[in-house]
């Protein structure tokens, strides 16, 4: 079952559905019912019609012995989705969390009796309409438990995703990888959203100096938290990581900007909140992060 029929949720559900004959094998649960007839458009432009079970009520979800629940909701909606769904599920089935930020992974892992794995992906997708999703670019997914447990489950799920055309690897250091992704998102998303620019424009004046200032704060914080730095041949591994992502995604418009323009809630709390709280605990000043938080908090409160 996939919970959250956004771009990644639908890409995941339809990709998994392609690998089986039974249209009821994969179900897609959301706050509104989508058409059961869906179209998955591949990166090379091929349109594949697929039939899938779509649901609104968790109590209607078919329970299967090999069931896995993938939570692909936005971070701010995930805890509510989990609490609504949990009473209807067998207590030992695996959950997979696909959220940005670092707000829900530990709380849900502590509350669920079964395996809770976290996934981080670079797959690209966007929704055309209620029955059409585009797999815009192939990426890679890593999946694992925060403490490195449930290795066999992680391997099985990675194999299942890879078989569905979504290249995946089971890892033992998913928490470190989530920290790395959090740093990237904390630098890029708020600045792109504030100035309404593409990722690549962060290379230009005056944005590049704000990128550097934010990276200086985050490098100090990651060192204080003893988070292993990403591989690098330079003395500035965190700077290298973020600038590489900016180069690679130069034409992209960050998800936080897309959310703002669509008048949707952003994931600013899940991305900036854990970093600011960790900095406060460590006694580290983060004026750049604080400024981004305040700007997004005002916009969020304005609706």
What are these regions (language model features)?
Residues 1-52:
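NAD(P)+-binding Rossmann beta1-loop-alpha1 motif at the extreme N-terminus of oxidoreductases
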Residues 16, 108, 185:
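Aromatic pocket-lining residues of Rossmann-like dinucleotide-binding sites
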Residues 89, 132-142, 193-203, 252-262:
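Helix-loop-beta segment of a Rossmann-like dinucleotide-binding subdomain
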Residues 212-303:
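NAD(P)-dependent Rossmann-like dehydrogenase/reductase catalytic/cofactor-binding core
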